[in-house]
Amino acid sequence: MEKEVIAYLDNETIIDSQSVKNTNLKEIYFDNSKESLEVIRHSCAHLMAQAIKNLYPEAKFFVGPVIEDGFYYDFRVESKIGEEDLVKIEKKMKELAEAKIEISKYEITKNEALAKFQNDDLKQEVLLRIPDGAVSIYKQGEFEDLCRGPHVPNTKFLRFFKLTRVAGAYLGGDEKREMLTRIYGTAFADKESLKEYLTIIEEAKKRDHRKLGTELKLFTFDDEIGGGLPIWLSNGARLRSKLEHILYKIHRLRGYEPVRGPELLKADAWKISGHYANYKENMYFTQIDEQEYGIKPMNCVGHIKIYQSDVRSYRDLPLKFFEYGVVHRHEKSGVLHGLFRVREFTQDDAHIFCMPSQIKEQVLEILAFVDNLMKLFDFSYEMEISTKPEKAIGDDEIWEVATKALKEALDEQGLKYGIDEGGGAFYGPKIDIKITDALKRKWQCGTIQVDFNLPSRFKLEYTDSDNEKKQPVMLHRAILGSFERFIGILTEHCAGEFPFFIAPTAVGIVPIGEAHIAYAKEIQKELLELNIDSEVYEKNESLSKKIRTAEKQKLPMILVLGDDEVAKRSVALRDRRAKEQKNLSLDEFIKLVKEKMSEVHF
């Protein structure tokens, strides 16, 4: 069957089929391509709004954009809408889709639009946010809404969709404004793709790090402490400590020096850096001795001051500082999400001060570091370079040198990468590291950022080989991004079944009776000397219940100890990953776990 054209692509702009006058544009067919799904999902958001309007005539709508993997619409309605109402909204959407309603577009002036929607305060809000000029309106049946589009030409294209959840959302993301209802959904071009996506969604619910974090006793949150401030429990703290230890060793082997800057800096420092003018709303400030101080949202200023603490020569470069830096950033309560979006987090942060000629060499080394670490946790990854934006500091030559160095480093490593033209920060180009988890979801984690700005603002210098003062380039580099976010991603990636070398509790030791506890404690001590955490299940419970408790904690290994094991100094091993049970001497078991720990190599 021949695919139908639903829109056209003009460079990177998607245009409605009905708006096209130039027939030389690239056709967008009705399929699951990125461009097609954007049109389908945008249209499906309007289909949902039309269904809601039919069911709740008093409903008023704010905005309904396409997001990654779907869409949402924010609206006001008198009735309280819950998850149970999604079924009837979906049913109405299907009726409208089956009715094959033509979707048309027309344009009016902004003033005409303000008059047309004069009794709709939410539409007035939308119109106040857009520039003067022509305003486009999409119409399907009796339903009309403001929208830039594009949309499919007919509701018949909107058959394979699912409404996924209901939430609250502040008007315009402003916590001081009213709370609107938000419904999320997704849509595809065919039934199979929708079914596959919904299967992944169900699996993602089981793997949700917030759910597993509670079940595995990794972390918690407390309203009396405050939103976005994670509390690490013993298991989570052990997991995090193991990750920190691995990273520390890799950093040291790669020539990084550990440093630590203060968490509180005078506002003057943030004024020099530009954070005060450009990032103040995301920071926390306080007064000490009638002077203003800011809690750091980033670690770079502290590292700059460490660079400035000594006279630097070209022979000293590159200088590589790293820190597990605790930072605080003000996030609106509505966007806080488990460990993924918090107000306090710890970055695996490093700053490299080097000469422009050393950028490529340093980026190559960072890429090797990234590859090493991602393979360790079984993540695939991809890269994206963001280039010079319209507004930028630094001359074209230094931008060209830096961007070329990033591209050459990626090419030399044989890594595929995308290019976000003009998407760089004003102070330098960057590489974004995006990892793919077991559910094929992509996560933005690390960044390699070239910076000409801060060295200039703080007047950093080194003495060159010709005895002249030169300004170094600064590379900001985080591989995990933050420990919190990465641990959240890792928890979902492995469904809480952490690799042996990083598991908070790697071995569960189950003595059958009281007579076997002493031997269990002996094994526990021996494992601890190998930096392997274990737990002895010594409660007065049945053997099956003890084993079940250990299995619920998703421990990599469980040892069962009875009279025979005590007498022979052996263990009955249950290996979760290998899905096998076997008897080993204690010496053989210790050899086995040593081998597992040695799998972590750099």
Curated annotation (Swiss-Prot):
Binds 1 zinc ion per subunit. It is found in: Cytoplasm. GO terms for cellular component: cytosol. GO terms for biological process: threonyl-tRNA aminoacylation. PROSITE patterns: AA_TRNA_LIGASE_II. GO terms for molecular function: ATP binding; metal ion binding; threonine-tRNA ligase activity; tRNA binding. Its cofactor is Zn(2+). Zn(2+) binds at residues 300, 351, 476. Pfam families: HGTP_anticodon, tRNA-synt_2b, tRNA_SAD. It comes from the Bacteria. Gene3D superfamilies: 3.30.54.20, Anticodon-binding domain (3.40.50.800), Bira Bifunctional Protein, Domain 2 (3.30.930.10), Threonyl-trna Synthetase, Chain A, domain 2 (3.30.980.10). It catalyses: tRNA(Thr) + L-threonine + ATP = L-threonyl-tRNA(Thr) + AMP + diphosphate + H(+). Its main location: cytoplasm. Keywords: Aminoacyl-tRNA synthetase, ATP-binding, Cytoplasm, Ligase, Metal-binding, Nucleotide-binding, Protein biosynthesis, RNA-binding, tRNA-binding, Zinc. Its EC number is 6.1.1.3. Residues 208-499 are annotated as: Catalytic. PANTHER family: THREONINE--TRNA LIGASE, CHLOROPLASTIC_MITOCHONDRIAL 2 (PTHR11451:SF44), THREONINE-TRNA LIGASE (PTHR11451). Belongs to the class-II aminoacyl-tRNA synthetase family. Catalyzes the attachment of threonine to tRNA(Thr) in a two-step reaction: L-threonine is first activated by ATP to form Thr-AMP and then transferred to the acceptor end of tRNA(Thr). Also edits incorrectly charged L-seryl-tRNA(Thr). NCBIfam families: thrS (TIGR00418). Homodimer. This is Threonine--tRNA ligase. It comes from Campylobacter jejuni subsp. jejuni serotype O:6 (strain 81116 / NCTC 11828). The gene is thrS.
